[in-house]
Amino acid sequence: MFNLNNKGQSLVMFVLIIPIFLLIITLIYDVANAIYEKDRLSNTIWIAIDYGLDNINDITKEELNDMIISNVDGLNYIDVIVNDNEIVVKASKKVKGIIGKMFHFELTTINCNYKGKLIDDKKEIERIVWLWQVKL
């Protein structure tokens, strides 16, 4: 009877699927970026505590604070406590991804708390709290 042309249907399906596909790619990028920033903050704190424990007699709170701030951009909160044989670092950072930039909100907040001790000239560094909050 009628000879139907399916090219229009394919075009409509393509136009409907492209935004969904782009949204999925953007979400994957945002999550990967948040994981990268979490690892960067966590590793920087760990290295700063390791360095501080190596130089426990000479290091000051301000030097460790400056070391962390110079290696991690956009910290919201940082607290460094240096005691006799113990260093505690608490830091927080907000990560804004592509979706957050489009809609003006922070997608994730990363909190890292580490504690390092010298026990019989042996270093022990432990993670106290590691929190990754997603705010939608």
What are these regions (language model features)?
Residues 1-64:
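Alpha-helical assembly-interface signal, strongest on the long, hydrophobic N-terminal helix that forms
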Residues 55-136:
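Short, conserved structural patches
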